[in-house]
Every structure is written in structure tokens, then in C-alpha cells.
């Protein structure tokens, strides 16, 4: 009787996208933090702006939430929650650059399924809102969400971070130590926000930028810088 053959092993290249996804992260999550700027009329815009970009082999979307509709409050701190979904990143960043604002892109490498999960999070927000078809262009779709905007949140920073956390749950771990409204807001503004309960989490773009620059709990792939004064 022939002797039994020893076990043989060989490496087989997978054709299963899910297996490839688990082994080779190839998507990017970018937290885009825009700095303050001075408008052409001399008005100072000191609060900055945050948006979230999800880039994979199948899509490249930038989620840009802000006070792009009716506003209210003493300082215009609340209003309609408008989400702009850009399918053309260059069109988005061109608009930011036109303000002579510097935008820092904090880039994280993620798996495709993480990017899809974050994309689905925003899809649910859009589903619960209303598309403003009159504002749609070849580069962007615009939606009025069911939840209004407020300076303390939901705002551009908190919504971007919430979306990022779907993909990277610990991306804001430790950020509460950088929640320092006094770095940006004057006394009157801080008192007005305190009357609304104060900030329970990091909500200002400048504070987010400092946190990601100094204490990001997740390793950055790189940091890109867009725009600035020419």
C-alpha cells in the first residue's frame, strides 16, 4: 500500500473582494478642517469649517454641513440644517480656496467596508430630509435635513466627526481635552452658548484641528494642505 502523502499547502490568490478588503485597506477618510478667513468686504469669519471626504475605488464624496439656509439666534448660531454632498472634490475645494482659507485634510487609510458604512450613515440622513433640487448642480446635491443646525451641534464639526466615527469609532477618543471654546469665541458668544447648556463635546473646527494635529488616537496616513493666501 502506498504511503500516505503529507499535507500540502499552497497560496491561492483570492478573487473575493471581501477578502481583499480585509487584507488591503485602500479607501481614505479625510477630515477637512478649514481655517478662518477675511471676506472681500473686510468681515472676519473666525469659526472655520469642517467637512468629511470619503474616497474609495467606487466613489469620492464630500459631506459639507452648515448654515446654508435660513438662520436664527442672536449670533446666527442656529438655523436650517443643510447638507451639501459633493461628487467633485475639486469643485468643493475650489470654493474653499476662493475664500483664501487654508484647509487641512487629515487623511486616514480605511477599508472599503468602513467607507461604505460611513456613506450609508449619510444616506440615512439624506433619506430623512428633503432634496433642494433647485440648488443641485453637476458637482453637488443639496439637502435640508430633518434636524436643524446649531452652533453647539449638530454643526459642521460634530456631524463630520459623527460620520467619521461610523468608519473609525475611536477617531475622537480624547478630544474632550481639546474642547476649548475660549480659543475662538469671545466672552459674549461663550455666555450665549452657556445659556443653551454649553458644549458637551468638541464642536469648533479650530479645536478639532489642534486635536488631530497633536493627539489623533488613530495613525494618520498623511496631512494635505489646500489653499491659503496667495
Sequence positions of predicted segments:
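Aromatic sugar-binding interfaces of carbohydrate-active proteins
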Residues: 175-184, 188
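Non-catalytic ligand/cofactor/substrate-binding and regulatory segments of enzyme domains
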Residues: 2-152, 185-230
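Active-site nucleophilic cysteine motif
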Residues: 47-49, 146-178
